[in-house]
Amino acid sequence: MAGNSIGQLFKVTTFGESHGIALGCIVDGVPPNMELSEADLQPDLDRRKPGTSRYTTPRREDDEVQILSGVFEGKTTGTSIGLIIKNGDQRSKDYGDIMDKFRPGHADYTYQQKYGIRDYRGGGRSSARETAMRVAAGAIAKKYLKEQFGVEIRGYLSQIGSVKIDPQTVANIEQIDWQQVNSNPFFCPDPVAVEQFDELIRELKKEGNSIGAKLTVIAENVPVGLGEPVFDRLDADLAHALMSINAVKGVEIGDGFAAVEQKGSEHRDEMTPEGFCSNHSGGILGGISSGQPIIAHIALKPTSSITVPGKSVNVHNEPVEVVTKGRHDPCVGIRAVPIAEAMMAIVVLDHLLRFKAQCR
């Protein structure tokens, strides 16, 4: 199975399954002499881990990361950093009923058709549990970016189902209340929307159903010049990284699809000696960072793991009914904010190292 790595100079390779012994990753390209310990990685993992609120899956995992290599006397050595997280709260018996069934909307069918075998326990490798290692690796990237270049990467949830935040709460990046974002389980900057999200999720849990979400991730203080046209454009690599997150079905950079209804006189980011007058492009022009904040939005589908019965087939292509009995999130977007931050950090650091190697 290929496709387990991302990045060129800053390269992350993950391994492990949802109900396996452990999850792990190898992080190559971390510059030497950066102070690093598990305590630097754990806060982001705690933001992502399951069982932290009544709005997410009841599966409880400590997600305590251990650094296996690449750090000596509290500093990175420049060699590969090995990370591991032990799985602890697997309940594989919950998946006995779907051993030979394909859950509609999941990767069960395609994995079976491609490989002729699949780990049906919690989705195996296709489970979002794998993203814990992305968050751990991303925390390394975020730390280096902030300490060495002042780059800060943060995200927030802007929509669950048809419930949207007040756009005025995020109209100006400098005025986003990040304390509010970090003080509620939805990572939401709008306190009114938090109450509406709460009500919506409660109803969905009663129904045994799920819902989709939209979130935004922003990188501030990114220097001008990151990105390698034409095929390694910064926005192309960001889209690739963000689309690789489980359940993501759409990515927008800047105004994204809203640009369809804009005129050129509106969408172009005019400039003055003092700087740009707008940021419709999301901080990227011609595939290269412009020095403005990089803004990306992602849409996540509603999880297909629900207790509402659904039609499907089994491995013998016979019709069956599927009812998911495992523990799942009613809205996967709630825990996706730190994952999106991690993927943006991995891409930005990779391109920053490539920029330094080529241009300065």
From Swiss-Prot:
NADP(+) binds at residues 48, 54. GO terms for biological process: amino acid biosynthetic process; aromatic amino acid family biosynthetic process; chorismate biosynthetic process. Coiled coil: none annotated. Reduced FMN (FMNH(2)). Its EC number is 4.2.3.5. It comes from the Bacteria. Belongs to the chorismate synthase family. Keywords: Amino-acid biosynthesis, Aromatic amino acid biosynthesis, FAD, Flavoprotein, FMN, Lyase, NADP. The keyword Amino-acid biosynthesis applies. Homotetramer. This reaction introduces a second double bond into the aromatic ring system. The gene is aroC. The keyword NADP applies. GO terms for molecular function: chorismate synthase activity; FMN binding. This is Chorismate synthase. Pfam families: Chorismate_synt (PF01264). InterPro entries: Chorismate_synth (IPR000453), Chorismate_synth_AroC_sf (IPR035904), Chorismate_synthase_CS (IPR020541). Pathway: Metabolic intermediate biosynthesis; chorismate biosynthesis; chorismate from D-erythrose 4-phosphate and phosphoenolpyruvate: step 7/7. It catalyses: 5-O-(1-carboxyvinyl)-3-phosphoshikimate = chorismate + phosphate. Its cofactor is FMNH2. Gene3D superfamilies: Chorismate synthase AroC.
